[in-house]
Structure formats: C-alpha cells, structure tokens
Amino acid sequence: MSKTAKNTKTIKSVKSVNKDNKPNKDNKDDKNVDEEVINWLDKYKPTSSSQILGDKNNINRIKAFLSQFTKENAEINCPNLILTGNNGVGKTLMTDLIIQEKGFEKITADLTNISVARKSKKKKKVEKEYNGSNRTIKTYYTTLYNKSVSPTGDLIEKKIVVVFDDVSNISNNKEKEAIKSIIKINSKEKKIPIIIIANMKHSKTVNELKKMVTVTVKNTNSQGRKENKRTSNEIIIKAPNPDEIREFIAYICRKENLKLKQRKSDDDDIYEEIIQHSQFDIRRLIYILESLKMIHGNNDVTLDEFDAYREISKTKDIDPGIYKATGTLLNDYEGISGALSLYEEERATIPLMVHENYPSNIKHQYPKMSVEDQISVIHKISESISESDKIDGLIYSNQCWSLQPVHGFYSCVLPSYFINMHPNKLRMSEIYKYTQDYNKTSIKKINNKVIKKAQENQHLKRVSIYDFLYMASILKTLLERKDFEAVATLMKPYGLKLKEIESIIKIDKIKKMKNTLTGKQKTQLKELLGVDE
C-alpha cells in the first residue's frame, strides 16, 4: 500500500474520533467514508476506450489487431501483440476495455500445470506427456482454440483473447519458456489473438518476445522493387500529456468541489506541481486528489498546503531501466542517495554497465580535455571499480549482504562523481553497450572446457594456455592464406580431429577470422589430416 493510501486511512480514523477518543455520532458521513474513498477510483475509471487519456492512435492499433480475427476478415498478418509502457499508464485497463468493446472474452493463461518441450542430446524435441493435470503446450493451445470454435467449425460469437500480463516480473523459468512456446505456435497457426503486457524494465524475456512478435511490412525501395520487412509488433503506451491531465484534474475538482487555488504570489503552478508529484500516473493522481479532499474538505488548497502534503507523501520509485540508469550515472551526478537508488534497481548489471561504458563517455563527452587528464579520470574510476570488485567477492564468498551499499558506493557513486566533476562536459545523447562481462564469463568456461579436452591428447598434456594461443594465431594465419597443406603438416602429428582444431582456433577471441571455412575446404582439410570428422 502506498503512503498516500496509508495517510488517507489515518485521516479517516482521526476524523471519526472526537476529543474523548469516542466515535463522533454527529458526523453522519463517517460511516460512508470507506465507501467514498473506494468509489473515487471507481467513479473516474473509464467505462469506454474513448474516455481513456493518452494517444488515441494506440487504441485504434489495438482495435485493428483484434479486427483480424473477425469472420469477415480471414487474413491475419500478425496474431501476437506486445504492449509496453511505464507502470500506471493504463496498459491493462486499456486492453480490458477494448477487448470488451470488440466482443472478445479475456483469458488469463494459467501456466502452472504445463510441461515444456525440451531438447535431448540428439537435438530432437522430446515432449513428455504427464499423467494427471499436466498438459503439453500443444494440448493447451488446442484447448484455447476449441473455446472459440463451434462443433461445426464456425467462430463462436464470443471470441477469446489470451493475455499475458506483467511479463517483465515473471521469475519462473518454466512459465517464461511456456509463454515463448505458445507465441511460437501461434505465430505459425494464427488462430488466437495473444496480447503480452510488459513494463519498461529491462528483461531478457521481454526482449526475446519482441523478436518473436513480428509483423511483415510491405515496402517499395528506391528502385521500385517490393520489399517485405519484418518489424516488432509492439505498441509503446506513453503517459498522457500534461494538458490532458490538467483537464482531468479540473473535471474532478468540479465534481468533488475540491478547491485548488492559484495565488498571484505563487512562483509555481499548483496544477503543474500536482502533475509532477503524480509522476504522470493517473491512478496515483486520483489518490493525491482524494487525499487533499479528505484533509482540506471544502477549504481552499493553496500551493503552501500542497507543499506540506508533498513533504509527507513519498514519490513512487520508478525503475529507469539499465540504459537510462547508466546514462544518468555517467552524465548527471545525483549525490550519494541518488546514485545508490539507481544501483539498487539492478545491483549486478548496472555496475557492469558503468564499467563497460565509462571510458567512451570520457572520450566523447570531454573533447577539450587533454589526454593526460582523461587518463587521470580513468585511473581514479578504475581504482574505485577495482575496490568494488573486491567487496563483491566478500559479499558472495562470505554472504555479507550488508556490504551491498558499500559495493554500490565504489561501483556507482564514486565513478559517477569522478566522471561529472569536471567542467565543460557536453552531455550529448549516447548509445550504451550492454556489458560484455556475462559473455566473457561464459567464454572463459568454454575455453577451459576446450583446453581440458585438448589436454587429454598425450601430445598436448603439458601445453599451457599461452601455447594454445600461439597455436590458434598461427592456424588462423595459415587458414586465411588457404595454406591447408601447412595446417595439415603442423597438426597431423597430434592426431586431432578437425572439430578439435577448430575449437583451439576459437580460443583466441581477440583476432577473429575474416572468413569461416566452407564445406569443401573442411572436406579438403579432413583428407589432408587423415580424419573422418
């Protein structure tokens, strides 16, 4: 429960008790206070899509998506749709109203008893049929489709829409895989409209779904040729503009006799301040207006009264996303508490994002800074990140979770301070790279596995990692020259298969081969090496 709601309940309890700490019998409205508070949200909740605040084009796009599944229109371009937007912008409400208006029935998928197909060692999909209530993805999908089809094969008047809500916060891997499997089947079968709802929080699952939920767009290039381009079928729901919200506030004030008074001496606009405090969240906005009415009744609410209310009403925490958080840390130092709050959003990833992107930020945002000064800043930040790495090791090796703020201080706060303390920073928009650390960890394990496998060969038991790197470098050079006989002469005495030689070549990640080996070249090498594979 938000602090605003808690404050409202506190106000209600104070109003219903007199000085003698007894119920106030004279106040006839006390009995209905709870009902009135609840009805504030119900009273101003849109009953049709035309009443929804925000971009009407998004509403039309969702309606057009559902219209594909009517009897008259059999052609379905894309059966899946993904809606993204910040919390509180009305994604779910908008979806529910449009589904109702278009004559569909909303189905919230229950994925608890669904078994997901897995790949065996032979890379063949094996789908286990479980006894009891467990169902396969295909069985579940068929069940959904049968709900919208009559025994004669005609579409039932009450069609269904499957909605996966709040996908960004799903933590169960089984459910994630089930959703992806259902989307994959529906992309092929195109029998059921599926809507995915997610927030703007960084999520690997959501990113994967965006790549799966695609639509074909027909274009004509500059030469007059037709081209089919696949793009993500995503609708980004943005918050209403301030003018719309201002009109909505004025409407509620008229209906509830809430007197917001703007004085000539006020430096700021009270409407604008309320909008900013609501953070463009309409649900939160209604709670704020409700609280002001409960506190001040029919009295005027000036900017001073609102400032006093704002002091005790905490703003909601907004997840800025890892890229926006990285940009804020690198280009705008917000103090210790501000930087730590960004760190708290994604403790593992954001420090790595800072580490990945701070050198390029210094280079591009300080063009007038000398190379020596740039190196000095990099040195300070790298020392701080190095300290954070030591603390990170202590946290996970000794379970010292209380040290996480210290880790955040060295990994985010100090780097943000050092990188923003110098004058004349451009602060231009940048495209940040996703951290390569996770990939490097995976590569390290793969390389260790390859080296251990190669060292099983009696000729390579005592070969060090440096020797393998030299081997990889020499082999790459020879292969790029297409000198296959030289490769065979060097490697034949070791008795290695071509696959093992290719694995050794891949150990060197610094210098990549310009061209991979073709099938004919691999066959030629196998013959020269005297191996089958």
Curated annotation (Swiss-Prot):
Biased composition annotated in UniProt, kind: Basic and acidic residues: 17-31
SUPFAM superfamilies: P-loop containing nucleoside triphosphate hydrolases, post-AAA+ oligomerization domain-like
InterPro entries hit by this protein: DNA_pol3_clamp-load_cplx_C, DNA_replication_fac_RFC1_C, P-loop_NTPase
Gene3D superfamilies associated with the record: 1.10.8.60, 1.20.272.10, P-loop containing nucleotide triphosphate hydrolases
Gene Ontology molecular function: ATP binding; DNA binding; DNA clamp loader activity
Biased composition (Polar residues): 1-11
Region named Disordered: 1-31
GO annotation, biological process: DNA replication
Alphabetized UniProt keyword annotations: DNA replication
Lineage: superkingdom: Viruses
TM annotation in the entry: none
Function: Part of the RFC clamp loader complex which loads the PCNA sliding clamp onto DNA.
Family, similarity comment: Belongs to the activator 1 large subunit family.
Name of the protein in question: Putative replication factor C large subunit
Biological source species: Acanthamoeba polyphaga mimivirus
Origin organism lineage: Viruses, Varidnaviria, Bamfordvirae, Nucleocytoviricota, Megaviricetes
